[in-house]
């Protein structure tokens, strides 16, 4: 065993220890912990930095030819079902450790400034450290049971972080939605794990892969059962990586603090699903039906995420749907056997998307003092525009991330996405067509986000009353604003916002509250660049966004087959990569189609949203009325599809939420009136029967009590019934009354 492998357990232990210490301090000594909260944040960051330092050393040992390493200890000794706990280190593990720790450290540095005015500052770092520790534990897990446990811990932390501002109803609902949706996937994952154990007799990833290969070779397995277990296992990644149809939680997860959005959507929670598919790729690749299922789910998710992002006005939600689409690309690549391209895109996308989310947080942080602390305002791209002039560093770094997601060389995502597009087209023209069309949509909506946010004129001042007739993009250019209807035609109105003070309204609950600590004085009419601790992570993330993709470029891999990560990332690749025949000319020729598609999407976006756009405000002007009606209907359909989330949330609400409530009410009524009615009826009849048996049991005392009770009751009735005496003739009075 290599000496350094024996210290791998320190990697998840450091952030776990930080979360435990801060949690105990917050619980036992809240006053002192609050006073020393900056020290608490520094401690969390330093401990995670220790993990970040160890991870590259494991990485270097792997690329220098060290074998994979597995250490395990007996957890529950049992002769039939022995359970072990340990860690497994291979190239996939080492590179994921670097990804999680580097992004995690930068998010912590960023959060120190972003969350500085929040009353839950220390609590945030407790959750953040535990979240990172859970993800690191998942990456190092050596068996399926351990993976399942750490996945549940990741889900619990995401519940806490998405609902961090739990006094806001939207945040409380969002964390519940994410938790319940992931429980559906995790239930399928649990069934799949049990089914795989039944087939192979092992939970250890290395052992079950070998046993499954032997069973396949000897025809000792029922393929229907194996595919069923594999699809059930895949339900876990479907939920965690927000794949269709369990993707509905992802945009609502934007209710959490923006640094958490960066961590969830870049390196941790959503990456956990792709990581599990990669870890179990030995198992999946032997089942063509399951691989086809994975590829189609990925393709549908990629296309759906791109279409849902087209008309989003919320900055973070647009990036969330972008994440959903890119994760679909990764699943598509996994399904067609392009394992290397999928993991390559996972890495390049993680750094690019972390940069974009942290950049959006910088924008939101600067917009809040101007438009208010409501997410409907500070995240609304309709109130932004022209921010590059006021926030140049944020604007430039955000542009880097945008160009990377669009697939423009030499940025990171170009290299990985280009490989996925080429492999998908070679595998299936249908899947390839979906992937290429989605690439064009990606370039369009990412350019749209950048242009609406950073280019043009600053629109917030117009929206809060200084200028009420400022032009805004039309609805038919897929811009979402407040709409009214006039004579059957959809027209735009400028949002009527009331200027807010630079403190949050109480109705927004536990939002970052500058009133607890005086914020820096800002010009309330125009935003300013964020401070150093928020800018530093953006600059550092811009470096891998620009250069890390070139590590996987074919022309750079010649002569370095054992020293670059993407050549050894998987020892069992299902396709071979050409290295000798590819040169600059081949690379350019192969990349022309993807660059052309991305450029077309950017060009359309520039035409509609660019600062020099010459199109009329309403695209119907100057167009034939008959053609305009068709075009308007088409654009309205696209707008409604995007704005209403593809109607899937409404469908789920109608079928599952309302359906379950109706079913629950029906069952409650049946239980109350039928089941309880029968039980209560039997009880009442038993009560009266018992009383009757008591007074009819032959006891003299019981007979006397009954006789006296009856006579008294009869006498009372006779006296109260006055008409009885009036109907009796006078001659019979002496029978009733004695007269003197």
Curated annotation (Swiss-Prot):
Family annotation (Gene3D superfamilies): 1.20.5.2700
Catalytic activity of the protein: a plastoquinone + NADH + (n+1) H(+)(in) = a plastoquinol + NAD(+) + n H(+)(out); a plastoquinone + NADPH + (n+1) H(+)(in) = a plastoquinol + NADP(+) + n H(+)(out)
EC number: 7.1.1.-
UniProt keyword terms in alphabetical order: Chloroplast, Membrane, NAD, NADP, Plastid, Plastoquinone, Quinone, Thylakoid, Translocase, Transmembrane, Transmembrane helix, Transport
Membrane spanning residue stretches: 9-29, 39-59, 87-107, 124-144, 147-167, 185-205, 219-239, 258-278, 291-311, 327-347, 354-374, 395-415, 425-445, 532-552, 584-604, 673-693, 705-725
Pfam assignment, any one: Proton_antipo_N
InterPro entries per the UniProt record, alphabetical: NADH_UbQ_OxRdtase_chlpt_su5_C, NADHpl_OxRdtase_5_subgr, ND/Mrp_TM, NU5C-like, Proton_antipo_N
GO biological process: ATP synthesis coupled electron transport; electron transport coupled proton transport
Highest taxon of source: Eukaryota
A single Gene Ontology CC term: chloroplast thylakoid membrane
Subunit-structure text: NDH is composed of at least 16 different subunits, 5 of which are encoded in the nucleus.
Reported function: NDH shuttles electrons from NAD(P)H:plastoquinone, via FMN and iron-sulfur (Fe-S) centers, to quinones in the photosynthetic chain and possibly in a chloroplast respiratory chain. The immediate electron acceptor for the enzyme in this species is believed to be plastoquinone. Couples the redox reaction to proton translocation, and thus conserves the redox energy in a proton gradient.
Family, as annotated: Belongs to the complex I subunit 5 family.
Protein name: NAD(P)H-quinone oxidoreductase subunit 5, chloroplastic
This protein's encoding gene: ndhF
């Amino acid at each position: 065993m290599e000496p350094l492998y024996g210290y791998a357990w320190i990697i998840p232990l450091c952030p776990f220890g930080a979360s435990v210490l801060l949690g105990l301090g917050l619980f036992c000594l809240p006053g002192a912990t609050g006073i020393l909260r900056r020290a608490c944040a520094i401690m969390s960051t330093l401990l995670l930095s220790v993990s970040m330092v160890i991870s590259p050393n494991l990485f270097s040992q792997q690329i220098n030819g060290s074998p994979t390493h597995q250490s395990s200890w007996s957890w529950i000794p049992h002769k039939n079902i022995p359970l072990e706990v340990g860690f497994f280190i291979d190239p996939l593990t080492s590179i994921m450790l670097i990804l999680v720790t580097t992004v995690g450290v930068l998010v912590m540095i960023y959060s120190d400034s972003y969350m500085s005015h929040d009353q839950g500052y220390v609590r945030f770092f407790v959750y953040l450290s535990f979240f990172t520790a859970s993800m690191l534990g998942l990456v190092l897990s050596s068996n399926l049971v351990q993976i399942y446990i750490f996945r549940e811990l990741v889900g619990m932390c995401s519940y806490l972080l998405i609902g961090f501002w739990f006094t806001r109803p939207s945040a409380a609902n969002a964390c519940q939605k994410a938790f319940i949706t992931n429980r559906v996937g995790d239930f399928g994952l649990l069934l799949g794990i049990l089914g795989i154990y039944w087939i192979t007799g092992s939970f250890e990833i290395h052992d079950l892969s070998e046993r499954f290969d032997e069973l396949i070779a000897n025809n000792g397995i029922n393929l229907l059962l194996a595919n069923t277990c594999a699809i059930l296992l895949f339900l876990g990644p479907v939920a965690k990586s927000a794949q269709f149809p369990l993707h509905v939680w992802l945009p609502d997860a934007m209710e959490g603090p923006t640094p958490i959005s960066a961590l969830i959507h870049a390196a941790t929670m959503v990456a956990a699903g792709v990581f599990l598919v990669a870890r179990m790729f030995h198992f999946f690749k032997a089942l063509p039906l399951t691989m086809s299922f994975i590829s189609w789910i990925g393709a549908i998710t990629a296309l759906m995420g791109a279409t849902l992002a087209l008309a989003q006005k919320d900055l973070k939600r647009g990036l969330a749907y972008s994440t959903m689409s890119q994760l679909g690309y990764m699943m598509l690549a996994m399904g067609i056997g392009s394992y290397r391209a999928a993991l390559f895109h996972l890495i390049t996308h993680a750094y690019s998307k972390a940069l974009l989310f942290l950049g959006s947080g910088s924008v939101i942080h600067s917009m809040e003092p101007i438009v208010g602390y409501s997410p409907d305002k500070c995240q609304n791209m309709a109130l932004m525009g022209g921010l590059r002039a006021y926030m140049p560093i944020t604007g430039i770094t955000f542009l880097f991330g945008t160009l990377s997601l669009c697939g423009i060389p030499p940025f990171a995502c170009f290299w990985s996405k280009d490989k996925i597009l080429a492999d998908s087209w070679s595998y299936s023209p249908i899947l390839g067509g979906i992937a290429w069309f989605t690439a064009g949509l990606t370039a369009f909506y990412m350019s749209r986000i950048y242009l609406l946010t950073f280019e043009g004129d600053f629109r917030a001042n117009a929206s809060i009353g200084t200028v009420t007739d400022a032009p805004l993009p039309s609805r038919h250019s897929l811009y979402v604003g407040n709409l009214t209807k006039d004579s059957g035609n959809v027209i735009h109105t400028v949002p009527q916002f009331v200027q807010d003070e630079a403190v949050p309204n109480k109705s927004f609950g536990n939002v970052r509250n500058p009133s607890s600590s005086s914020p820096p004085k800002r010009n309330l009419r125009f935003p300013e660049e964020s401070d150093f601790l928020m800018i530093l992570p953006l600059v550092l993330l811009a470096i891998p966004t620009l250069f890390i993709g070139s590590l996987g470029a074919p022309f750079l891999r010649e002569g370095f087959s054992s020293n670059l990560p993407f050549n050894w990332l998987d020892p069992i690749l299902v396709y071979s990569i050409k290295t000798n025949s590819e040169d600059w000319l081949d690379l350019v020729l192969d990349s022309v189609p993807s660059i052309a598609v991305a450029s077309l999407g950017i060009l359309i976006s520039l035409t509609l949203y660019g600062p020099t756009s010459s199109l009329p405000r309403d695209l119907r002007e100057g167009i034939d009325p008959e053609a305009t009606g068709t075009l308007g209907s088409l654009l309205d359909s696209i707008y409604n599809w995007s704005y209403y989330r593809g109607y899937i949330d409404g469908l789920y609400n109608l079928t599952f939420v309302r359906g379950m409530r109706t079913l629950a009410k029906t069952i409650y009524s049946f239980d109350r009136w039928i089941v309880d009615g029968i039980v209560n009826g039997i009880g009442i009849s038993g009560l009266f029967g018992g009383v009757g048996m008591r007074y009819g049991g032959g006891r003299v005392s019981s007979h006397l009590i009954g006789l006296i009770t009856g006579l008294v009751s009869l006498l009372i009735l006779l006296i109260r019934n006055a008409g009885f005496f009036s109907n009796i003739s006078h001659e019979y009075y002496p029978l009733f009354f004695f007269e003197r």
